[in-house]
From Swiss-Prot:
Allosterically activated by N-acetylglucosamine-6-phosphate (GlcNAc6P). Keywords: Carbohydrate metabolism, Coiled coil, Cytoplasm, Hydrolase, Isomerase, Phosphoprotein. Homohexamer. The modification Phosphothreonine is found at T161. NCBIfam families: nagB. Its EC number is 3.5.99.6. This is Glucosamine-6-phosphate deaminase 2. It comes from Bos taurus. One of its GO terms (cellular component) is cytoplasm. It catalyses: alpha-D-glucosamine 6-phosphate + H2O = beta-D-fructose 6-phosphate + NH4(+). The gene is GNPDA2. Catalyzes the reversible conversion of alpha-D-glucosamine 6-phosphate (GlcN-6P) into beta-D-fructose 6-phosphate (Fru-6P) and ammonium ion, a regulatory reaction step in de novo uridine diphosphate-N-acetyl-alpha-D-glucosamine (UDP-GlcNAc) biosynthesis via hexosamine pathway. Deamination is coupled to aldo-keto isomerization mediating the metabolic flux from UDP-GlcNAc toward Fru-6P. At high ammonium level can drive amination and isomerization of Fru-6P toward hexosamines and UDP-GlcNAc synthesis. CDD domains: GlcN6P_deaminase. It is found in: Cytoplasm.
Amino acid sequence: MRLVILDNYDLASEWAAKYICNRIIQFRPGQDRYFTLGLPTGSTPLGCYKKLIEYHKNGDLSFKYVKTFNMDEYVGLPRNHPESYHSYMWNNFFKHIDIDPNNAHILDGNATDLQAECDAFEKKIKEAGGIDLFVGGIGPDGHIAFNEPGSSLVSRTRLKTLAMDTILANAKYFDGDLSKVPTMALTVGVGTVMDAREVMILITGAHKAFALYKAIEEGVNHMWTVSAFQQHPRTIFVCDEDATLELRVKTVKYFKGLMHVHNKLVDPLYSMKEGN
């Protein structure tokens, strides 16, 4: 497990974007060899997406041979609703890059048979060869995707009832009106994300500091689903200084002492431009 600590949100976002960029380019994707990327929504990854868009517009990165699988989607919210994750991904990322829309997979929260939709999503991931890099974020209660506290740590893509903490947190996106906030969602399982060859989890802000503490300094616990990734062979937690406030001083000191190693993963930043 790696813990990468940057001074602030912008630097953490940039480090994460550089890492994704380098992993895609090192993979050398092509017509018969797609890089498969798992993606989150929410406020945390926005800075990372902006940097990836910048790399694309500069000609350094192409998503032509990338397939994406999103973590989750609300149930019952129209696809074109401004707060649907289809809208989020299109407006904040997909419409700014060269990905084929057929290669951008998002769960359909309006499917007639929701369980069949979940099963089909798992099948699509398998047919794509599995996820090369799954990027995630967490909530203050340590949930990843919509795997709320108490979720099975071997769970697969399924229908979930949202915890009240999550509904309250999401109310800001629905004019503060709890009655408008979806109470159910389709989500990949903890096991689905654990199956990825590599996982990178973005954690920023003091309000997520206790969750980061639970994620890496205490044992694996289904009440803090993000803690499951202690047992993944290739997990990177990328955080800002504020998110480390609940960690032991020696933990922070240890991982900061490794930053010269971690920075070699993103420096130099590779490019798809000819000659780079």
